[in-house]
């Protein structure tokens, strides 16, 4: 079986492992170099993960009915949480908007799971490791084909230092440029 869900909005697509890892995503176009390419290059490919502190006991994915919104539920030693991933596409002012934006909503379901948010994009097919610039509520990844920005209400220091945080409320992450 293929352990990935697929989301996209006709500008880009992302393959999301049932463990929450975005292991394949070309950005900003389908024919661009991947920014997350762990699916093909485990060592240099880069990924965007929302892993629990301990081991994953159970995981499953499903789409919200009649949508391209992917829900991944993770059960771990400390509890259970859900990651909802989607790429917005909407109609407004008599035109279609297809922003280069990936949204991740992380909800605690049971217990007090600790998770690590790890965003490791790459450029030029795994050859470029971008520089990180930390601002008040976002991290910019510089040196890629297009500047990449991760905006979140998670404490940025936990992301930069690859530390676990207790998920006791719903959190959001937006990946944009």
Regions picked out by a protein language model, each given a short descriptive name:
Residues 2-18, 22-177:
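Beta-sandwich/jelly-roll carbohydrate-recognition scaffolds of carbohydrate-active enzymes
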